[in-house]
Structure formats: structure tokens, C-alpha cells
């Protein structure tokens, strides 16, 4: 048994090694080598000593690897193959191939090398095999036993193990036994044993201490970086660790997580957060646009848009992001004013996000706050001191330089040195570092740095005393030497030098206090003025695009996209393009390119882009001017071929517009005529206005149409005398007097005045048109009672006689009364009516222009919309109000005109009465003339005694005709005044009335009067025959 035990142990150990070779990295043998058991100790003691002391001998290592394994591997493989084989085995499978042998040998070499490496580590670490083997320090190769015991208690540093060390861990090893993933340094040095002297520190220990110091400095920097602001005290380690755990970077997130679930996208109820979450951002919006939109409310700490990275996020067609303000107050105002507002056609959805670290300096400062952080302009005084007057008003002119030293010292003592914190972080850190060493080392250090860094531009602030950086450096150094804290200082003005200027320290981070009320009002007042207009940079970009536009597809496409993206300012863009096309000196290719731009914008005006339809509306008002300017350019072209090419390109645009149906065909034909020079813009406007002023043909029909037929077709005695006068005289009376009669107005209202479709403007002039269409005069009504009495006395003979004589005398009457008097009256009435209608049309055009302007302002939002009314109802209400106002003015003018006419009539009637009283013998002369015997009337006794009323009427008509001819010859320019005087004569005779009828176009009455004397025998003969019967 004694012989078997060593051999058996040796055999078992060899089997263990051979199995380790085939087990791909098991660490059981490794554990046996480092920590042997009691049963194996006698058999393992012999090979361990030479392996430990002669590990550098290559031949010994090869013998150690090769000697026991090759002999044992073959019988083991054969036994395994025999145990699991079915049937006969081939001889080829019993022997390993050359490649397998090489791989097996390579594995054995790696295994042996790993064991030797572990034993090498164990020589310095200790014999405890359960712990991880790492480097601690160097030592002697053949160390004594006491030294090994001491090494076990020394501090340990984790070092990443080799790739073989991971394979030697057993599979059932717990995760707690694995080495930590962070660099941990034991700060306390383990105590030495009694009686052992302290050794001299090796290079490895010195390197370890240096690593400790670097790690401490790194931890300190992380603590400083984790603060919310440099003006707050440093936080504890637990706070910094919690912040680092709460705010993982976006880089560590999985790419599959949507942006909506990003850190900060949900309100956690933090009352101090200044971070706003934006949930609905236009994909075309970038960080710069967000800064300009949100920066109006205060300085911004950070702006971030979460750009889509996956197809799913791009399909949403909206982005999200975060905007962090420097203080809570500004963030609350931004949330209140921008939540739900439309920005670039997207409704802004805002909410609170998680707090983010606030940097010392904001990334965006509003222009209203920028002046507080900008340094003052150079003044020429030491340290760039500013006089008090110029500090209040930077635009004030510079004061003249002092003439003597006393004035200079006085100015300098009253000046103020304004300290501004530099915005460049590198320069600010260098200044702070310089101040730290100057305070510690003294002014000699500053002198040495100035001598050494005289050519370094970073240290220029030490030499240039008037720069803002030097002013800040000098103040900060003085403040630290006076006992101020680096984060808090006194803000009162003070004198640094005796009889020197006042120094004004910067405020304690003004960005953390928010914008003042004045700056808030300035930021909000600027917004309405820029509504619907381009910004300065956008206007400059548009002008630059138009200047460099060429007839290329890409250039025109880019310009069209710019126009559609800024469709809110469509009116300004259309004006700018129209102005660019009006310049005659512009080269023809640029003109064609700008016309193509107009065509592209009009084509895309029906696209689903916000406010794109405005271009069709605004271009419609400018296209006439555009093509008029193109016509001027076309006429200035000298070459025939070049002009034809230009013409063909323009006509191509017309054909395309006709296919697109952008505008109606009559409008396109009009534009084409303007371009070809067939129609001028001014003449086109005049021709458009004339038909509206005349309102068609009713005026001519009223003058020349129905009234003549009414007069010719009805017998004289069967119709009222008022109908015999016709339209012109009545219209003249109405033009003169302005007082229409109620009876005639009612009768005329039932007649159709217009024979074409009436326009909406005819409702305004309806009363005046009816008054002008009245065919009777108010003077006829005064004499109507007398005429009715005369007509009752007429007998049946006169009626039949008149009927027979009417047909025979038509031709004579037509020739007799087709005199220039009628034409003159017609022309005068027509001219006056056209003048009146022209004046009224001009007023109506002004009203319509006001209505159009009101509608444009209502649509663009400049005028508020009344609740409960649509746009059309509000426009109609405005038009009715203007028309009512104009009608009231017209009524006032009519009253004044009537008043003046009445005064003139009264004065003329008085004159006429005095004239009639002076001539009382006219009636007697008339009676004598009427009772004189005639050959025909002597045969009838009745006619001699009672003179005929018709003869009297004929005589009166002749006398009145002579008087009217005399008065007309004396007053040729005013025929209406003559007729008015004759009609308004208060004398007993009806001479004025007869004179008026003599000039009328009634052929029956005048014919009867002309025959009253010449055909008296014939008439008396007929009357006598009827009396006999």
C-alpha cells in the first residue's frame, strides 16, 4: 500500500493535468497548483521547487509541459473511443492528424504559460489562492517567508487581468467574488509588523501615490462640475452621485427609445426647474430659430432639439426638444405666452421638464439685455473710464479733451470704470488662475509672467490696460485682496486709487434674476409691428436671391421655396419682386428668371402650405404693372431676334397660366394686350369706368324713346295736357328746381326704368333717376285747372276736325320742329346728367376702395373680427355705413341747392310782377284781335259773338314764340333760365305755358296752333254743317 499511494497520487495528478488540457480553460488545476490539499502535498513538493526557482529556463519549461501529457493522452482517447464506438473503428480515427496535434500542443503551451504566470504573481502576492491575483509592488524573486507574510497584508490595487484569467474562474463563482469595475484606492496604509523596519519606497509605490493624487484631483473637478452654478457652494459626494445617476447622457440610451421618453420630457413637480419641454416642433425649425423665439423672454441656458434617428421618428413629421432658461421667472413667462401658440404652422405644446445644470454664462442673451453685458466704447481715459453723461447715453457725442491738467483730473475723478465679466471661458479661467497665483506669490509673480509671456496673445490682458479683460483682472484681484469671496462681492461703486475714477463692479450674475419690466415690454412691443413682414435678414436674403437669380431650375426652385416658407409676408415679397421687374437696366436673362419665379410661385399657391394662397391675391393686383414694365423693356430691345426670343418666353408663361387656370381667361387676355402694347393701363382704367358711369342704355331711351310714342299715338283731347310735354322739358325743370312731385313719382315708379340687369350701385341713385325720368312739370299742375275748363267748352266739331288734320300735317310738323333748339336741349341735358353721374361714380369708387382696404385689413388680422359676424357680413355692414354717410351728405347738399333756387325764384317772380304791371294793355289788345271779323266766321253768328278758344290759344302761342325767341337770342347760354322765367310768370295770361309748348316736340298741339288762322274758313264751314244737322 505504501508503494501504491505515491504512485496512485502521481497517476491521479497526471490524469488531472491531461483532463485540464482538454477542458478549454477550467481553473480546477489552477486552484490545485496555488492551493494544494494535504493528500497531494507529498507528491507535489518535488516538482514545485525546481519550477519555482528555475522558471526562466526554457528547456525546463518545455520538459514540464511535454513529458507527462503525451504518454497519457493516447490511452485515454482510445478508452473513450472504445466506450462510445459502435461497430469497428478505423485506424485513421485512432491517430490524431497533424493539425489536431499542433492545436493540442498549442493549448498545452498556453496552459503551462498561464500556470507559470500565476505562480509568478503568487510569489509577490502571497499564497492565498482564493483572492484575485494583481500587481501591488515589485520585490525580490526569492523572497523570504516573512516577506511573503507581510505582502499579504499590504494594500491591493485592481489591475485588469489577462484573457487567461477570465477562463480560470469556476462557473459557480458568485458575482461578489469578481473584481470591481471601478478604480478603488485604499487611502490608509496597512500597518507593519512589530520589529520590521520601514522600507524605502519603490518606484511602484511612488507611482501608486501619484495615481492617488490624480484621482483626488479628478474627484474634486467632478464635484465642481456637478454644481448648478459657480455662485453656489459645492455639493456633497452623495448629491453629485445622485445627479450623475439621475441624468444619464443621451449617448448611453438605447437607440430604440423614442424621444418622448427622454429624460426631462415629463414634469416631476420640481418647483425650481427652468427646463421647458417642447412637444410639437416644426421639422424645419432649428436651434437658432428656437433661440430667437424663446430668447425674447430671457437669457437661455441651453437649447436642444431631439432630431429623429429612426424611420419611425421621421414618420411623425414633428420634433421635440428642450429649452432651459437661466431663471424660473423667465421660463414661467415663456410657458404662459407660447403654450398653444402657432409657430411655423405648428401649435407649440410646452411643459416642465427635469432640471438641468445651469452654466455660468447663457448661450443666448436677448438684445435688450446685451447692453448690460457689453463693455462701453473706448473713451481714451485710463482703464477706459466713462464720463457719467456718456455712460447714461452711449450714443452721446464725445466731450472735447480737457485743455489743462486740472480739467483732466476733474473729469477723471468723476468718471466711472465699468467692469464687465469676459464671456470667453478660456480667458476667464486664465484670469482666475493668474489671480490665484498673484495672491499667493505676490507681485513678483505677475512681473515674471509678463516678462515670460510677452509674446503670448492669451496674456495680452496684462499689458493692454484699457481692454475689458484687464479691467476685470484688476478689479477681481483687488476684490480678492479686500476679502471678497470669489462667488460673492460688493456691488457698490468705490475708488481704487486716490483721486481716481469710480469703479463699478459687475452685478452678481444678472441672468439669474430675469429680465426687468422695461425689457419685457420692449420685447413684446416689437412683435406686432413685425407681423406679416419680413425681418431685416430675411429681406436682405430675398434681395440677394433676386439679384443673383438666373434662369436655371435649381436657382428658381430655391427662390420659390424661400417665398413659400415666408408666405406670411406675401405682400412684401410681391412688392419686392414687382419692384425688381420694373428696372429697365436689368439684364434680360434676370428679367426672364424673375418672371419664371412669379410663375412658379403662382403655380404653388394652391399647395398645402400655410398662407400660400395669398400670392394669387397679391399678384393679381400687381400683374398689370409687371407686364406694363415688361412691355417697356420689350420696346427698348434693339435686336429683332432678341426681342422675339423675349416675347416668346413671356407668351409661354401666358399659355402655361391658361392651362393651370390660375386666373380667368379675360384677365389673361388683358395682361397679354398690356404686354403687347395694345392697351395702356391708364386707358384701360378709363374704359372700364365709362360703362359703369352710364349704366347701359336707359338714359338714351328715356330721352328719345317712349315719350315720343306716347305723344304721337294718343289724341290730344283724350289725354291730359301734362303728357304732351315729353321728357326733356320736365327733366330740365327737375334739373333746375330739384323738387320732384309725389304724384308723378308714384306713377313713374311702376314703369320699368332699366332695360338691363341693374347693378348694386343703382340702389344709391334710384331716387334721383326716378326724379329725372318724370315727364311732367309742377308748373303744369298750377295751370291744369284752367286748361280743364277750356277743354270742357270745346265741342265735337273741333275734335273731329283735329283727328282729320292730324295725319295730313305730320310731315310738315316734323320738318318744322326738327330745329336745333331740340338738339341743343338734348345735348345740354345729356352733358349735365353725365357730369352728375361722373361725380357720383367717383365717390362710389372711393367708397369701394375703402371697402377693399377694410377687407384686406380684416383678412390680414390688422382689424379685429366682431364676434357673431362673418367676414362678408362685416364688410357689407361697413359698406352700408359708408353709403349712408354719403347719402346724408348728398341730402344736405340738395337742401342747400333747393334753398338757393327758391331764393332765386322769388327774386325773379318779383321782377316779373313789376314788369307785367307796367304793360296792362296786353289783354285789351288780345280781345280786339280775337273779335275782329273774318270771312268764314261772319257766316256763323255764334262764332262772331263768342270767340273760339283755339284761336286765342294760337295767337298766344305765336306771341309767346316771338318773345321766347327774343329772350333766347339775348340769353343763348342759358336756355333753361328763359323757360323758367316764362313758366313762372304770375300774369293772368298763359303765355309762358304756351311758349314752352311751342318749343316742345309735340307735333299735334303745335300743328293745331299753326293752323288756327290759315285754315279758319275750312273749319268754320265744317262747323256750320254740323250745326245744320
Swiss-Prot record:
GO CC terms in record: nucleoplasm; nucleus; U2 snRNP
Protein name: U2 snRNP-associated SURP motif-containing protein
Biased composition (Acidic residues): 786-806
Assembly and binders: Interacts with ERBB4.
Residue ranges, compositional bias (Basic residues): 45-54, 991-1029
Cross-link (Glycyl lysine isopeptide (Lys-Gly) (interchain with G-Cter in SUMO2)): 80, 145, 168, 208, 748-749, 760, 822, 829, 832
Record's keyword annotation contains Ribosomal protein: no
Domain RRM: residue ranges: 274-355
Gene symbol of the encoding locus: U2SURP
Compartments (UniProt record): Nucleus
Region (Disordered): 1-111, 141-274, 778-841, 855-1029
Coiled coil: 92-121, 192-232, 837-915
Biological processes, Gene Ontology terms: RNA processing
Classification via InterPro entries: CID_dom, ENTH_VHS, mRNA_splic_Cwf21_dom, Nucleotide-bd_a/b_plait_sf, RBD_domain_sf, RRM_dom, SR-CTD_assoc_factor, SR140_cwf21
Residue numbers carrying N6-acetyllysine: 760
Residue stretches making up the CID domain: 534-679
Composition skew (Basic and acidic residues), residue ranges: 55-64, 97-111, 144-155, 186-222, 239-249, 810-841, 874-922, 950-980
Organism per entry: Homo sapiens (Human)
Gene Ontology molecular functions: RNA binding
Modified residues (N-acetylalanine): 2
Modified residues (Phosphothreonine): 719, 931
Phosphoserine found at: 67, 202, 236, 485, 788, 800, 811, 946, 948
UniProt SURP motif repeat ranges: 430-473
Residue stretches of biased makeup (Polar residues): 7-16, 169-178
Keywords: Acetylation, Coiled coil, Isopeptide bond, Nucleus, Phosphoprotein, RNA-binding, Ubl conjugation
SMART domains, sorted: cwf21, RPR, RRM, SWAP
